[in-house]
């Protein structure tokens, strides 16, 4: 994002990386921020407690799908995905909690974030 990176990931081997978030593409109307990602259940802009989700996966299609799915599902969706053997995630919520998949070589750069267990 424009404020800088939260951290960095060291990858061994190739993979696809997709990030979903509402921090760059949004519209603010009467003080309320509307994300560009549409909730498929309501047809309205997504309301979520996450600010960003990044997925590392062997498939570009899957990484894009998963980053959007997890972002729209919010923090209640994260636990289902943190221990996957098929992909890894890094996500942050509005309270600056950080969610990182087990086994992902992630280095935190921004000390204002804290790891969420």
Predicted regions and their residues:
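Mature catalytic core of soluble alpha/beta enzymes
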Residues: 1-117
């Amino acid at each position: 994002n424009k404020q800088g990176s939260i951290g960095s990931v060291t990858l061994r081997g190739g993979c696809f990386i997709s990030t979903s978030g509402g921090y760059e593409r949004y519209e603010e109307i009467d003080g309320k921020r509307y994300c560009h990602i549409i909730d498929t259940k309501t047809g309205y802009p997504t309301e979520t407690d996450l600010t960003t989700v990044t997925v590392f996966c062997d498939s570009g299609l899957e990484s894009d799908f998963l980053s959007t799915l997890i972002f729209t599902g919010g923090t209640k969706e994260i636990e289902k995905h943190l221990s996957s053997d098929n992909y890894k995630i890094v996500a942050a919520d509005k309270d600056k909690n950080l969610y990182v998949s087990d086994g992902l070589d992630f280095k935190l750069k921004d000390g204002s974030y804290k790891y969420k267990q």
